[in-house]
Amino acid sequence: MAGEPDDVDAMIEPVVPSRHRWLAGLLAAAPGDRVADLGCGTGSTLAQVAASLVVGIDVSSAALARAADVLAPVHGTRSLLVQADLKDPLPIADASADRVLCHDVLECLPDTDAFVAEAARTLRPDGRLILAHTDYDTLVFTSEDLQLTRQLVHAYCDTQQPWMDAVDGTIGRHLVEVAERCGLVVEDVQATVVLSRRFQPGELGWGYAHNIVGALQGAGRTEQAVLDGWLDGLRRLDERGAFLFSLNDYAVVCGRMRR
């Protein structure tokens, strides 16, 4: 990727353990399996899996440092963390992984098909690859200005941030197409909704709203006064108990490439 992302996961991950349990459930790893998480972030999903070895790969040294702290009490010496750019060949041997996960990575990569082929290369013959992604165009906020909220969400979905090599914020709804185009066997398709009813620091809706503001500020796409006014409106809704936020995550469970 173009560079190390800001510490976005630190703001979002702690309040969505259900997302990581969902992903771990899709992996369905057995105690003797080898599991790789491509774009592991701070290790929250790997901490949920049973495996003889977990491998986390991420471009961010800061995320990997946090992942080491998260995984040490769970997996001890059975975890391996590697800093690598996922647009390059993966530092994993052919047919060496029983389970491979890629969550919220594809939108950032310039060649998704090449990456998926690389991920499939690492799978053992009976292995399982999970392609999972948030569809950022499904971000829902109750708002005092519906049209403005729609505009901000769409703009955020389409904004390439400095640490991204590409942007496709709606990739979540296209995962089946990606998998089948790459010759994978699609075994299952699932979705989950993450919900938050408070607009407070540490809550998911608060985190995503401030991510939106930060991204659009950095891109110079929206006036600061407009963004500040939008956040103020969300705070007022929270004070009245009328705030609600949700987003959709999609996942495709895949077997190895068709011959």
Regions found by a protein language model. Give the residues of each.
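A short glycine-rich, Lys/Arg-flanked "PGG" loop and its adjoining helix->strand segment in the class I
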Residues: D113-R128
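A short acidic, Gly/Pro-enriched loop at the edge of an enzyme's catalytic core
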Residues: L90-R99
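C-terminal helical/coil "lid" or tail adjacent to the Rossmann-like core of SAM-dependent
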Residues: A2-D7, D188-L244
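Class I SAM-dependent methyltransferase Rossmann-like catalytic core
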Residues: M1-P17
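Class I SAM-dependent methyltransferase SAM/SAH-binding core
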Residues: A36, T42-P89
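Conserved alpha-helix/loop element of class I SAM-dependent methyltransferases that forms part
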Residues: P14-D33, Q48
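Conserved catalytic/acceptor-binding region of the Class I
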Residues: I130-F199
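A short SAM/SAH-binding and catalytic strip from SAM-dependent methyltransferases
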Residues: R99-D111
